[in-house]
């Protein structure tokens, strides 16, 4: 996935960390950085972890459509417009569109000390298709 701020125009991106194409807008405010992602049906990212010695993590805000986020070992949580999810650092998770609906969300990285992202395995089609 490429992320560039280009006069607020979206770039369509495809990357090994994301299933399906997605429109991405770069967002930056003070020490926070993030993406607004427009995700078509079946689009979701891989499992990943936002590492940080202190602080860090990620905030998800559903802008439109319907999507999911899931923490490893827990049930997936449906996201609808206005929903806000705070994911602490060191939590393995994924997020993306519902299997049958378009989804747009802000994914904001919370500033942290020695922060980094670790991209892991894809969410299997079998697991993903179980979502309704």
Please report, for each region that a protein language model flagged, where it lies by residue:
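Short acidic-glycine-tyrosine-enriched beta hairpin
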Residues: 73-90
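A short, N-terminal "cap"/entry segment at the start of jelly-roll beta-barrel domains
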Residues: 1-36, 41, 46, 116-132
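A short hydrophobic beta-strand segment most commonly corresponding to one strand
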Residues: 59, 86, 100-119
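Short strand-connecting beta-turns/loops that link adjacent beta-strands
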Residues: 31, 54, 74, 100-101, ...
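Asparagine-centered strand-capping/turn motif at beta-strand->loop junctions
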Residues: 96-97
